[in-house]
């Protein structure tokens, strides 16, 4: 069966109506919208973040996040506010080794970055001269490399701590 985007949207809308989540607008009704934070996670609006101190390669870190919590991935970043929040989490948990993996990469096509959670690439905050592909392809993104809050492209086999994220539907 071949689905076009309009068919898929209609199918999802039907499922939302049947499940009672759709209330006549484009918004989903959340359970609590970040008011109650999952123990051990840091909350910011309707997203939940967990700093993992164990250094892993980018790929192993992504798999770890997926196993940790349903719907979790390496963190995607969509605003200056969220970027600042992740900087705080990183330094709160480890001021000596602030470099962490986040979920961005251009593994599939050089300079076409995507997030592992499938969300839109709508924000970026690169260090000066980045992304650089220094020493060959550097398809994975680390955060806080040399300068707090700024991004760097890196070889994916490097081992760093990382931040996992999951997001719940929310209406404000």
UniProtKB/Swiss-Prot annotation:
SMART domains from the UniProt entry: CLECT (SM00034)
Further comment found in the protein's record: Protein synthesis increases significantly under estradiol stimulation.
Keyword annotations of the record: Disulfide bond, Glycoprotein, Lectin, Secreted, Signal
Cited CDD domains: CLECT (cd00037)
Protein name: Lectin
Gene Ontology MF term list: carbohydrate binding
Tissues expressed in: Anterior part of oviduct.
Glycosylation sites: 93
């Amino acid at each position: 069966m071949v689905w076009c985007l309009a068919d898929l949207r209609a199918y999802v809308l039907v499922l939302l109506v049947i499940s009672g989540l759709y209330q006549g607008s484009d918004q989903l009704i959340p359970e609590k919208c970040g008011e109650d934070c999952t123990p051990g996670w840091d909350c910011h609006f309707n997203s939940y973040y967990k700093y993992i101190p164990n250094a892993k390669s980018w790929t192993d870190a992504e798999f770890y996040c997926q196993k940790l919590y349903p719907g979790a991935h390496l963190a995607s970043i969509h605003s200056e506010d969220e970027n600042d929040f992740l900087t705080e989490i990183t330094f709160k948990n480890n001021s000596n080794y602030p470099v962490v993996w986040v979920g961005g990469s251009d593994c599939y096509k050089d300079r076409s970055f995507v997030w592992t959670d499938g969300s839109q690439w709508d924000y970026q905050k690169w260090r000066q001269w980045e992304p650089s592909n220094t020493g060959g392809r550097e398809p994975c993104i680390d955060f806080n490399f040399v300068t707090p809050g700024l991004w760097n492209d890196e070889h994916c086999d490097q081992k760093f701590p990382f931040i996992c994220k999951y997001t719940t539907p929310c209406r404000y």
